[in-house]
């Protein structure tokens, strides 16, 4: 692979990883992996009135133990509520609380700002490359 092509592929791969990280709620200042799963659970619960742990597990592809631990923490934090089925106390459901809705809105706002920054970077990338090449030519 030629030098310029290789550099462009590296750049595209780098941008793809950064966008994927943004989509997953990854934040460079807080590398806590729970953010991604928390965001996904809150987003799923915002779409429905309530979901069972099995539905959350199926929708998000998380392990049963991870769903249990994560939802337990979100209940403790007041971001989701746990309720039991009226006719069968063994069946539980989770629903998003107003605090959870506010947290999700904040996460979505941050994600939107991050997307805007990334898109501005992507749109300006050709100008950045051109300027870097001109600077390299001056230094030679």
Which stretches of residues belong to each language-model region?
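N-terminal leader segment of winged-helix/HTH proteins
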Residues: 1-32
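A structural signal for well-ordered alpha-helices, especially hydrophobic packing surfaces
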Residues: 16, 20-23, 104, 132, ...
């Amino acid at each position: 692979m030629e030098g310029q092509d290789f550099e462009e592929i590296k750049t595209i791969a780098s941008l793809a990883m950064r966008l994927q990280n943004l989509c997953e709620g990854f934040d460079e200042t807080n590398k806590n992996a729970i953010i991604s799963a928390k965001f996904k659970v809150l987003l799923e619960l915002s779409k429905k009135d309530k979901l069972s742990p099995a539905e959350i597990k199926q929708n998000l592809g998380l392990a049963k133990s991870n769903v249990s631990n994560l939802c337990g923490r979100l209940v403790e934090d007041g971001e989701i509520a746990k309720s039991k089925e009226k006719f069968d106390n063994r069946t539980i459901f989770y629903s998003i609380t107003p605090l959870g809705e506010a947290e999700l809105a904040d996460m979505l706002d941050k994600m939107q700002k991050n997307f805007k920054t990334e898109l501005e970077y992507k749109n300006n990338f050709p100008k950045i490359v051109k300027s870097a090449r001109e600077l390299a030519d001056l230094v030679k």
